[in-house]
């Protein structure tokens, strides 16, 4: 029977009544499904479908004058009304249209269909179970071979010629696919079981179907409309045909949601969402720059069509554990404010400790999500709360756990292999109080059918096996331990990307039996190291997986390290004693990732460049105990960090190798780029700086300007070579707004944006000059005009200027007093000066917020500044690297980003964080 509007209203009422009766937890999924059906019923497009159905049943089928030769005027008028209506994104499917409406319309088929075209007199039914095709027509009147782009669920569409191909085509009527309904409703007989199928972009000009990673059953789709705010859309992207973000997938991915931005306020966009379309621009198969351009040119209202993987289904399980000598025997990560997986506040199991309660029980696995411990809920709690709940348990512990029921096979979109991810999230071992868990350096992770923690020992052969490695630039790519008292030589760490990692045949816990035929079963550590070092380019290793022996050896080493730490603390030995310095605060001048330091004696502490650390125990020469200091106070977590001495020792040892290699190649004709490569290293490890060289190469002032850069530098620029590690700091109260110095590419655009967007917070100072005043200029507004050149020269010599130079025989400069005047008015003074001015401001007790914009690459510079050539981009990049080498220790923060918008948002956040009344300033005492 035909469907009428009153039928849909009745169905809608019944559905809403039924939904209101669903109160049980187990009805949650059903309730969500019903709400989706109700949403479809209430949509404008669904109402339009009902109108078309009524039009078809009442007007066309019941009209006696309807024929092929004489068409009634009423249907034509109605169709014309629909054609020019304001329905957004008018879409149509030939399969759902009555044949009387598609008589002269081009027909479409699947390339692999054997079914012949339907006769015009019979409605086109879909009985093969295919997903409904949602086709978007780009033109109102479609002719053969025109460019037609559509949104389809799983297949390419192509035009099929008809005898009437040359005749004009009537307009396509907008309809939508129908959702599944009970059989008795029968809105459209034999319609497919999927409603509004998630589309992917395809083009009919293609000869093969478009590539889609995964199936529609694995994805969900959403259209999100954002209003561009003052700080943009508030998210970052990565990917594209020229720079795949995940594996070989060329899609455009959301990599970051910026706090306070338009996307964050809207709340629907998520990290790892894939953008398919921006307004009407298809971005599923474009370069990164094209996607950025589409977002920039999208206007103030931006409509995003995104795809995301559906959440992994989970199985809930109750596990009862009995605490053993090692406590519960597992580690956790995650929580509110410390997400283990982006966008997910859950608490995850990240390690199962061998021999512990969880390991013996066998049910808890890496990747499991903890929902509750005893009666304490662990959903949407902080990491600290979860740790407290687990530690405050008795000997018998009930865990409520969610286990993923979906395993990903070779899938780039799979959740991270959290057994082995190099995560900087806090990772806590649940062990008896007083025992500090020792996180071993993880081996490089790969996606696999099941997390490595789920593998039983039986899955790994215990027989000796032969492994052949080719030595690379990083050596063989693994560390060894052991060799004392005949305990054997074990692999303790595998370097990500090294030969051992790439072979996939060695793992932590392997015992090395021989190297190139040299027996190492009873070798000392030195003998084993020598055998590996002298093994040549091709190295044949016989290894045997011995996890129990390695675990015992690891426990022994851990105990020894703990004893050494305790004895050094009690004896007070070391370069810095806590009895002498009860409270030592330092600023980190490098990034530190505890997972990449194989020598940690106990739980490490991650930090980044610019972080403030409270060193609570500096007694040991090699390791310090510290906690992080944030704007909200000191963190409760205490971890181990490398001491200043250890940082410098490791870096200098590395530099000896670098210098040796440089001399072997020869130093003649070295370009600046060669010198930079020799002397400048990533912030991921501390910087080495040659002060003599940096002094000679420093030149931030235009060649026509004579700078006084060297006059105040002699006191702190020596000839020695040193490594940047930590800077001692003190907390100081200030009653002024700190000046802001931004260095690096795009600094001018950032400076202008800050002043124009926040004129009440930022300002500029008035410079001084000895040149005569021009008629239109006002003294004190445009410049401070100095009549006596001798007086200005004297002020420069007396350090009353933070920067000065000469241009066309006239002096120009920025005075300390001018900066103070702006600061005392409560505004941040934006200074366009060189890095030398940072130290001069500090000497004048005006501590600036100095931010360095570090470009990721030459291509990154060209992408953000479209007008620069490749040569200009290369020179800009080299200048930036030189700036970083020269002034790193004076930077408050270092920022990086793919777009200017991302960089700008980071800078605003840093300035906000650094605008407190209490600030950290360099201390006079030295480490």
Curated annotation (Swiss-Prot):
Instruction: Region Disordered: list its residue ranges.
Output: 692-719
Q: What is this protein called?
A: Disks large homolog 1
- The chain positions of domain Guanylate kinase-like read 737-912
Q: What does the function comment of this entry state?
A: Essential multidomain scaffolding protein required for normal development. Recruits channels, receptors and signaling molecules to discrete plasma membrane domains in polarized cells. Promotes epithelial cell layer barrier function via maintaining cell-cell adhesion. May play a role in adherens junction assembly, signal transduction and cell proliferation.
Alphabetically sorted, this entry's keywords are: Cell junction, Cell membrane, Cytoplasm, Endoplasmic reticulum, Membrane, Repeat, SH3 domain
Q: Which domain of life is it from?
A: Eukaryota
Q: Where is the SH3 domain?
A: 581-651
One annotated Gene Ontology cellular component of this protein: apical plasma membrane
* Record InterPro entries: DLG1-4_PDZ_assoc (IPR019583), DLG1-like (IPR016313), DLG1_PEST_dom (IPR019590), GK/Ca_channel_bsu (IPR008145), Guanylate_kin-like_dom (IPR008144), Guanylate_kinase_CS (IPR020590), L27_1 (IPR015143), L27_dom (IPR004172)
User: Which SUPFAM superfamilies does this entry report, sorted A to Z?
Assistant: L27 domain (SSF101288), P-loop containing nucleoside triphosphate hydrolases (SSF52540), PDZ domain-like (SSF50156), SH3-domain (SSF50044)
Q: Where in the cell is it found?
A: Cell membrane; Endoplasmic reticulum membrane; Cell junction; Cytoplasm
- Domain PDZ as annotated: residue spans: 223-310, 318-405, 466-547
Give the protein family.
Belongs to the MAGUK family.
- PANTHER family from the UniProt entry: DISCS LARGE, DISKS LARGE HOMOLOG 1
Looking up Pfam families in the UniProt record yields: Guanylate_kin, L27_1, MAGUK_N_PEST, PDZ, PDZ_assoc, SH3_1
The way it spans or sits in the membrane comes to:
Peripheral membrane protein
Gene it is expressed from:
dlg1
**Which residues lie in Polar residues bias regions?**
704-717
Please verify whether the record's keywords include Secreted.
no
Location of the L27 domain: 4-64
Can you cite a GO biological process for this protein?
Answer: swimming
Molecular function GO terms recorded? kinase binding
Q: Name the principal localization, coarsely classed.
A: membrane
């Amino acid at each position: 029977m035909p469907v009428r509007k009153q039928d849909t209203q009745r169905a809608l009422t019944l559905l809403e009544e039924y939904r209101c009766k669903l109160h049980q937890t187990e009805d949650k999924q059903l309730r969500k499904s019903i709400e989706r059906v109700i949403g479809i019923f209430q949509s404008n497009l669904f109402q339009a479908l009902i109108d078309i159905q009524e039009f078809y049943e009442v007007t066309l089928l019941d009209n006696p004058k309807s024929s092929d030769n004489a068409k009634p005027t009423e249907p034509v008028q109605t169709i014309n009304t629909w054609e020019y209506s304001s329905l957004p994104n008018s879409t149509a499917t030939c399969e759902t249209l009555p044949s009387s409406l598609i008589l002269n319309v081009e027909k479409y088929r699947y390339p692999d269909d054997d079914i012949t075209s339907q006769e015009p007199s019979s409605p086109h039914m879909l009985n093969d179970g295919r997903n409904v095709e949602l086709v978007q027509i780009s033109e109102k009147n479609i002719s053969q071979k025109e460019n037609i782009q559509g949104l389809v669920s799983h297949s390419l569409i192509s035009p099929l010629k008809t005898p009437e191909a040359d005749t004009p085509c009537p307009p396509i009527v907008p309809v939508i696919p129908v959702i599944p309904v009970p059989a008795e409703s029968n809105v459209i007989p034999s319609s497919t079981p999927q409603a509004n199928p998630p589309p992917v972009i395809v083009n009919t000009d293609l000869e093969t179907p478009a590539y889609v990673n995964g199936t529609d059953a694995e994805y969900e789709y959403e259209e999100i409309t954002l209003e561009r705010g003052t700080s943009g859309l508030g998210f970052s992207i990565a990917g594209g045909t020229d720079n795949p973000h995940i594996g070989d997938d060329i899609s455009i991915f959301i990599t970051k949601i910026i706090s306070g931005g338009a996307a964050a306020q809207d709340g629907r966009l998520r990290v790892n969402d894939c953008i398919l379309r921006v307004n009407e621009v298809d971005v599923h198969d474009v370069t990164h720059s094209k996607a950025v351009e589409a977002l920039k040119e999208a206007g103030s209202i931006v409509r995003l069509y995104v795809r995301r993987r559906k959440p992994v289904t989970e199985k809930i399980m109750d596990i009862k554990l009995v605490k053993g000598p090692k406590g519960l025997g597992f580690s956790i990560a995650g929580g509110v404010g410390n997400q283990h997986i982006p966008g997910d506040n859950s608490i995850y199991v990240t390690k199962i400790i061998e021999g512990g309660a969880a390991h013996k029980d066998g049910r808890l696995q890496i990747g499991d999500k903890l929902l509750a411990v005893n009666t304490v809920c662990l959903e949407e709690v902080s990491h600290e709360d979860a740790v407290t709940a687990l530690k405050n348990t008795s000997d018998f512990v009930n865990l409520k756990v969610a286990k993923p029921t979906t395993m990903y096979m070779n899938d780039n979109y799979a959740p991270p292999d959290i057994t082995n991810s190099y995560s900087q999230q806090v990772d806590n071992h649940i062990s008896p109080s007083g025992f500090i868990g020792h996180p071993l350096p993880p081996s490089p992770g790969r996606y696999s059918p099941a997390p490595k923690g789920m593998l039983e020992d039986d899955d790994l052969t215990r027989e000796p096996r032969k492994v052949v490695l080719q030595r690379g630039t990083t050596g063989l790519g693994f560390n060894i331990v052991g060799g004392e008292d005949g305990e054997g030589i074990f692999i303790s760490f595998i370097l990500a990307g090294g030969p051992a990692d790439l072979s996939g045949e060695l793992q932590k816990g392997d015992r090395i039996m021989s190297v190139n035929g040299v027996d190492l079963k009873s070798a000392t550590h030195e003998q084993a190291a020598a055998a590996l070092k002298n093994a040549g380019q091709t190295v044949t290793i016989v290894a045997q997986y011995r996890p129990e022996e390695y675990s015992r050896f690891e426990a022994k080493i851990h105990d020894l390290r703990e004893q050494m730490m305790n004895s050094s603390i009690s004896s007070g030995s070391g370069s810095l004693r806590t009895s002498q310095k009860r409270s030592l605060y330092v600023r980190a001048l490098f990034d530190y990732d505890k997972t990449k330091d194989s020598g940690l004696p106990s739980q490490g502490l991650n930090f980044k460049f610019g972080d403030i650390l409270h060193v609570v125990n500096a007694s040991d020469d090699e390791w310090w105990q510290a906690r992080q200091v944030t704007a909200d106070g000191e963190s409760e977590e205490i971890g181990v960090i490398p001491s200043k001495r250890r940082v410098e020792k490791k870096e200098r040892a590395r530099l000896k190798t670098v210098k040796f290699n440089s001399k072997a190649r020869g130093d003649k004709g070295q370009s600046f780029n060669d010198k930079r490569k020799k002397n400048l290293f990533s912030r991921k490890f501390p910087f080495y700086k040659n002060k003599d060289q940096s002094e000679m190469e420093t030149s931030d002032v235009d060649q026509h300007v004579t700078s006084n850069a060297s006059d105040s530098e002699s006191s702190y620029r020596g000839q020695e070579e040193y490594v940047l590690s930590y800077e001692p700091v003190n907390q100081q109260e200030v009653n002024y707004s700190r000046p802001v110095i931004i260095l690096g590419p795009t600094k001018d655009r950032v400076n202008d944006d800050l002043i124009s967007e926040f004129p009440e917070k930022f300002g500029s100072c008035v410079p001084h000059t000895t040149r005569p005043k021009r008629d239109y200029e006002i003294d004190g507004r445009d410049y401070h005009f100095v009549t006596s050149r001798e007086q200005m020269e004297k002020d420069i010599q007396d350090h009353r200027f933070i920067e000065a130079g000469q241009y066309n025989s006239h002096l120009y400069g920025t005075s300390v007093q001018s900066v103070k005047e702006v600061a005392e008015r409560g505004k941040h003074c934006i200074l366009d000066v060189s890095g030398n001015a940072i130290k001069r401001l500090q000497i004048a007790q005006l501590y600036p917020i100095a931010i360095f914009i570090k470009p990721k690459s030459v291509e990154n510079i060209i992408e953000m500044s479209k007008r620069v050539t490749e040569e200009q981009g290369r020179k800009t990049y080299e200048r930036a690297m030189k700036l970083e080498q020269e002034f790193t220790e004076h930077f408050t923060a270092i920022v990086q980003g793919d777009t200017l918008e991302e960089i700008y948002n980071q800078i605003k956040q840093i300035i906000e964080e650094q605008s407190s009344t209490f600030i950290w300033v360099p201390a006079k005492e030295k480490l």
